[in-house]
């Protein structure tokens, strides 16, 4: 959530920054509610001052043995009036919070203005795409090595996949390799987190209320739960309602979880294969840090995700998302796009975002700087390190051979009991 003080102190700047994202801030509605909030606050403070004055008068009258019935009646009337004003204040504040909960984060000054993915500048590339002496296939056409879309549809429906045999083991190996790299080389703390979370948790990272249609929801007795669309939700909320000491920062969490997305609005996109699934595995990275460190933390986080692709020898590029392509909670985002020779193009495999204090304000996640009494909001960052299914897709397409075999990257062979290739079944 955007800082309310920033809205009150520099509304034109906020409106202009949001306009860069293509977001039309409801300025008139906001100003009306803000004026009501201020008026209620001033009225409540005035009534409280009058009550305090009457309280002193009542105390003096009682000490002198004087009749104070009239004063007490006035005090009761003021208390009733103040309660009504405070109820009005709370209702107005609730309406303000509802309005602001659907307003996206402000873009960082370094983020280029743009409309969509066509306006995203490329920052760098790594690796050279392989030259094939045959026409490489898309992964969806490599079904004989263990991709079973038919049973995915039978068991659940469209956008679900069954993996068989060595391919299923490779999928598991990829996740284990990612976890080992991030914990042993990059210093992350591995976490095992719930896949079902309550509404407050998923509100904290910004999925509610604006993106409820993208979520899977279930109910137990009178309690609502949401299936996580990413482990970012669970990992980031570990610090919700907490006041951390600066000495423990930065925190770096990693988790391997399934993720669940309805893919609302994706009809007709990536209908073949594993690129866009309702259920997929991902290794997620989360940083909790100080405002002073968050810019550098985004570069570190992105480098950690890149390291996985480098160790797997998969060509990729880094893209800086423009204002029109960023996620709701992000202030700045880098996308990693891996080369898929079967498709003949780069495809997203990771998004690494700095959310500044946007999520922290919703979660009330704070830290206390050394020597300071008053806590301040942490900064939160998240990124895929990486999407497991899309990494599998990239391996299938980049390591395919003319005879139908899929070579296993050297970095993954220790996780495959020395197996160096997957051979297609008859």
From Swiss-Prot:
GO terms for cellular component: cytoplasm. Residues 114-125 have a biased composition (Basic and acidic residues). Keywords: Aminoacyl-tRNA synthetase, ATP-binding, Cytoplasm, Ligase, Nucleotide-binding, Protein biosynthesis. GO terms for biological process: selenocysteine biosynthetic process; seryl-tRNA aminoacylation. Pathway: Aminoacyl-tRNA biosynthesis; selenocysteinyl-tRNA(Sec) biosynthesis; L-seryl-tRNA(Sec) from L-serine and tRNA(Sec): step 1/1. One of its GO terms (molecular function) is serine-tRNA ligase activity. L-serine binds at residues 230-232, 284, 384. It is an enzyme of class 6 (ligase). InterPro entries: aa-tRNA-synt_IIb, aa-tRNA-synth_II, aa-tRNA-synth_II/BPL/LPL, Ser-tRNA-ligase_type_1, Ser-tRNA-synth_1_N, SerRS_1_N_sf, SerRS_core, tRNA-bd_arm. Residues 103-129 are annotated as: Disordered. ATP binds at residues 261-263, 348-351. Its main location: cytoplasm. It catalyses: tRNA(Ser) + L-serine + ATP = L-seryl-tRNA(Ser) + AMP + diphosphate + H(+); tRNA(Sec) + L-serine + ATP = L-seryl-tRNA(Sec) + AMP + diphosphate + H(+). The keyword Ligase applies. Pfam families: Seryl_tRNA_N, tRNA-synt_2b. It is found in: Cytoplasm. NCBIfam families: serS. HAMAP family: Ser_tRNA_synth_type1. Catalyzes the attachment of serine to tRNA(Ser). Is also able to aminoacylate tRNA(Sec) with serine, to form the misacylated tRNA L-seryl-tRNA(Sec), which will be further converted into selenocysteinyl-tRNA(Sec). Homodimer. The tRNA molecule binds across the dimer. This is Serine--tRNA ligase. It comes from Dichelobacter nodosus (strain VCS1703A). The lineage of its organism: Bacteria, Pseudomonadati, Pseudomonadota, Gammaproteobacteria, Cardiobacteriales.
């Amino acid at each position: 959530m955007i800082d309310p003080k920033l809205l009150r102190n520099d509304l034109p700047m906020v409106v202009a920054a949001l306009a860069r994202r293509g977001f039309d801030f409801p300025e008139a509605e906001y100003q009306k509610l803000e004026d009501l909030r201020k008026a209620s606050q001033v009225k409540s403070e005035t009534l409280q001052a009058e009550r305090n004055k009457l309280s002193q008068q009542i105390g003096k009258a009682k000490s002198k043995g004087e009749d104070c019935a009239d004063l007490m009646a006035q005090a009761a009337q003021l208390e009733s009036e103040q309660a009504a004003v405070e109820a009005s204040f709370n209702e107005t504040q609730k309406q303000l919070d509802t309005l602001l909960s659907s307003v996206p984060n402000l873009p960082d000054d370094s983020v280029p203005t743009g409309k969509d993915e066509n306006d995203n500048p490329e920052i760098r590339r790594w690796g050279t795409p392989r030259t094939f002496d045959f026409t490489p296939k898309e992964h969806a056409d490599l079904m004989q090595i263990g991709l079973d879309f038919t049973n995915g549809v039978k068991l659940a429906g469209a956008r679900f996949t069954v993996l068989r045999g060595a391919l299923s083991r490779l999928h598991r190996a990829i996740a284990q390799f990612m976890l080992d790299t991030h914990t042993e080389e990059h210093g992350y703390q591995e976490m095992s987190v719930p896949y079902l979370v309550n509404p407050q948790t998923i509100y904290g990272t910004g999925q509610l209320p604006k993106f409820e249609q993208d979520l899977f929801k279930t109910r137990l007795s009178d309690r609502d739960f949401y299936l996580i669309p990413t482990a970012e939700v669970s990992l980031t909320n570990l610090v919700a309602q907490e006041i951390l000491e600066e000495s423990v920062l930065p925190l770096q969490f990693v988790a391997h979880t399934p993720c669940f997305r309805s893919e609302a609005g994706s009809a007709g996109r990536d209908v073949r294969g594993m690129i866009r699934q309702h259920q997929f595995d991902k290794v997620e990275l989360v940083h909790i840090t100080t405002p002073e460190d968050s810019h550098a933390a985004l570069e570190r986080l992105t480098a950690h995700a890149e390291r996985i692709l480098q160790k797997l020898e998969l060509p990729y590029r880094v893209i800086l998302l423009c204002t029109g392509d960023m996620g709701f909670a992000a202030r700045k985002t880098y996308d990693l796009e891996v080369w898929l020779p079967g498709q003949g193009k780069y495809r997203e495999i990771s998004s690494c975002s700095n959310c500044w204090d946007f999520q922290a304000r919703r979660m009330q996640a704070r830290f206390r700087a050394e020597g300071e009494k008053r806590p301040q909001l942490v900064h939160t960052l998240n990124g895929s390190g990486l999407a497991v299914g899309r990494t599998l897709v990239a391996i299938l397409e980049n390591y395919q051979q003319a005879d139908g075999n899929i070579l296993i990257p050297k970095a993954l062979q220790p996780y495959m009991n020395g197996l160096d290739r997957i051979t297609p079944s008859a």
